[in-house]
Amino acid sequence: MNNIVHKLKTLVLNEAFGGVLLIVCTLLALLVQNGSFSEHYREFLNLKVGFSVGEFELNKPFLLWINDGLISIFFFAIGLELKKEFLHGDFKNPKNIVLPFMAALGGILIPAMLFALVNIGDAYTLKGWAIPTATDTAFALAILMMCGKHIPSSLKIFLLSLAIFDDVGAILIIAIFYTTKLSIAAFVIAGLAILVMLILNLLGITRKSFYFICSVILWISVLKSGVHATLAGIVTAFFIPMQTKNGEAFLEEIYESLKFWIAFIILPLFAFANAGVNLSNIDIGAIFSGVSIGIFLGLFVGKQVGVFLFSYLAIRFKFAALPQGSNLKQLYGVCILTGIGFTMSLFIDGLAYEVSDIFNYADNLAILIASFCSGIWGFIYLKFFTTRS
């Protein structure tokens, strides 16, 4: 019995299993949205949830609590990982930053350029230029793990490192390009919350409740400020102390405690809430619109070309080296997987077009098709067309 429990625990904590769960939730969302439960699915997402304290009221649809709230926890974890890597990890050595940074840069610039070329001249459709710049790390990592032992572990580290810069890029894009009205009062409150966390950090105080209260205040104020609330997650992470005064790991403990919830609750719920594309409302004209073509080309072509090209140039001009034990074929295979935009692309799509059905959901379908093609082709290429160097 203990052996069975151990095997189940190992399976659940396996990163590849988290990716499989995302796939299941995606298919489930598509089935529910296009089946007899579609009305209940939409009612579930539009259900108003909130609270009020005096004159202050926060009442949002459940979908927005997922996209603005739960995903902030995901970005908080990304911030913790980024801080850990810069202070004590691989990024402490500047040379180790170059390859994933250049790869992420190429993975943002080239897809954005392809989307812009297809949609040039239309100011509204151009708002979606950032949709194909994102990568769903959980999906990409899950498929990489399924490709076999001949893929060196250094490529997994490369993909994770690239993902950190990719996510930071997504946060900056959201903060700069998808922010509308700004509230000075909310910014002042956010600044005070940050100041308190800075003082807590400098004093070496490691009471989780203090940081939690400050982070909630920061999140609400950022939400009300006009800047996307996910920014609060990564900002909070920067003020979490690495360790307690007794030398015990503090940041690492918080990060590890969040991994399960993010992999098996937050991201699957996000996938279920956002992947429900109504296929019955899609027409042929919308499928071949500039937005759909731009998204598909950006994710499936632009991502792999941009990531590989910038990585190759960094290696060719000796700014960086290939991940240990890997070759260019294997590196290219990982670059293909970065075209799996899925959850993050759906997220940015919702911000760009404000969850509008003006494209008859063809934009969401294009994200799913491009992500599916990138995943399948990346798996086939890595599994059957690469050899260990």
Swiss-Prot record:
<dbReference type="InterPro" id="IPR004670">
    <property type="entry name" value="NhaA"/>
</dbReference>
<protein>
    <recommendedName>
        <fullName>Na(+)/H(+) antiporter NhaA 1</fullName>
    </recommendedName>
</protein>
<dbReference type="InterPro" id="IPR023171">
    <property type="entry name" value="Na/H_antiporter_dom_sf"/>
</dbReference>
<feature type="transmembrane region" description="Helical">
    <location>
        <begin position="282"/>
        <end position="302"/>
    </location>
</feature>
<feature type="transmembrane region" description="Helical">
    <location>
        <begin position="12"/>
        <end position="32"/>
    </location>
</feature>
<dbReference type="GO" id="GO:0005886">
    <property type="term" value="C:plasma membrane"/>
</dbReference>
<keyword id="KW-0915">Sodium</keyword>
<keyword id="KW-0813">Transport</keyword>
<comment type="similarity">
    <text>Belongs to the NhaA Na(+)/H(+) (TC 2.A.33) antiporter family.</text>
</comment>
<keyword id="KW-0406">Ion transport</keyword>
<feature type="transmembrane region" description="Helical">
    <location>
        <begin position="62"/>
        <end position="82"/>
    </location>
</feature>
<keyword id="KW-0050">Antiport</keyword>
<feature type="transmembrane region" description="Helical">
    <location>
        <begin position="365"/>
        <end position="385"/>
    </location>
</feature>
<feature type="transmembrane region" description="Helical">
    <location>
        <begin position="331"/>
        <end position="351"/>
    </location>
</feature>
<feature type="transmembrane region" description="Helical">
    <location>
        <begin position="260"/>
        <end position="280"/>
    </location>
</feature>
<keyword id="KW-0997">Cell inner membrane</keyword>
<feature type="transmembrane region" description="Helical">
    <location>
        <begin position="220"/>
        <end position="240"/>
    </location>
</feature>
<dbReference type="Pfam" id="PF06965">
    <property type="entry name" value="Na_H_antiport_1"/>
</dbReference>
<feature type="transmembrane region" description="Helical">
    <location>
        <begin position="184"/>
        <end position="204"/>
    </location>
</feature>
<feature type="transmembrane region" description="Helical">
    <location>
        <begin position="97"/>
        <end position="117"/>
    </location>
</feature>
<dbReference type="GO" id="GO:0015385">
    <property type="term" value="F:sodium:proton antiporter activity"/>
</dbReference>
<keyword id="KW-0739">Sodium transport</keyword>
<keyword id="KW-1003">Cell membrane</keyword>
<feature type="transmembrane region" description="Helical">
    <location>
        <begin position="157"/>
        <end position="177"/>
    </location>
</feature>
<dbReference type="GO" id="GO:0006885">
    <property type="term" value="P:regulation of pH"/>
</dbReference>
<keyword id="KW-0472">Membrane</keyword>
<keyword id="KW-0812">Transmembrane</keyword>
<comment type="function">
    <text>Na(+)/H(+) antiporter that extrudes sodium in exchange for external protons.</text>
</comment>
<feature type="transmembrane region" description="Helical">
    <location>
        <begin position="128"/>
        <end position="148"/>
    </location>
</feature>
<keyword id="KW-1133">Transmembrane helix</keyword>
